[in-house]
């Protein structure tokens, strides 16, 4: 496990949020011209990457296979008075997500996937683009 994952969860949540504010959002705005109205994060953990999108008015959905991480994400979002939907599941078991997302984040996830090619092909089913 990486050292940054062993920090207190609130601190890690805040670091993720700051990284998104400093890098993800400016990058997305530069290359697309605007922010999407919906953002999905697969392997969202505590939801820190999604917080800045929620603060800017995006609908955010976080999926993580670990129910404990989803509970932490829900609690952090309540503390920050932000709305977000968090689901404990394998992303590809959720049929209602097809063709709904202009932006899908998979930060620090793909290295844990055995069949990466199939994993990425499956994203065509849930992305708008």
Regions found by a protein language model. Give the residues of each.
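Conserved N-terminal segment of class I S-adenosyl-L-methionine
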Residues: 1-99, 103, 107, 120
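A short glycine-rich, Lys/Arg-flanked "PGG" loop and its adjoining helix->strand segment in the class I
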Residues: 117-129
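A short His-aromatic
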Residues: 108-112
């Amino acid at each position: 496990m990486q050292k940054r994952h062993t920090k207190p969860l609130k601190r890690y949540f805040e670091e993720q949020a700051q990284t998104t504010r400093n890098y993800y959002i400016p990058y997305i705005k530069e290359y697309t011209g605007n922010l999407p109205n919906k953002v999905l994060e697969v392997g969202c953990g505590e939801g820190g990457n999604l917080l800045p999108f929620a603060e800017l008015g995006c609908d955010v959905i976080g999926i993580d296979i670990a129910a404990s991480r989803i509970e932490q994400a829900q609690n952090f979002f309540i503390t920050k008075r932000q709305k977000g939907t968090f689901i404990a599941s394998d992303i590809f078991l959720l049929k209602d997500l097809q063709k709904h997302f202009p932006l899908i984040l998979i930060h620090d996830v793909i290295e844990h996937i055995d069949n990466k090619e199939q994993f990425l092909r499956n994203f065509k089913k849930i992305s708008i683009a």
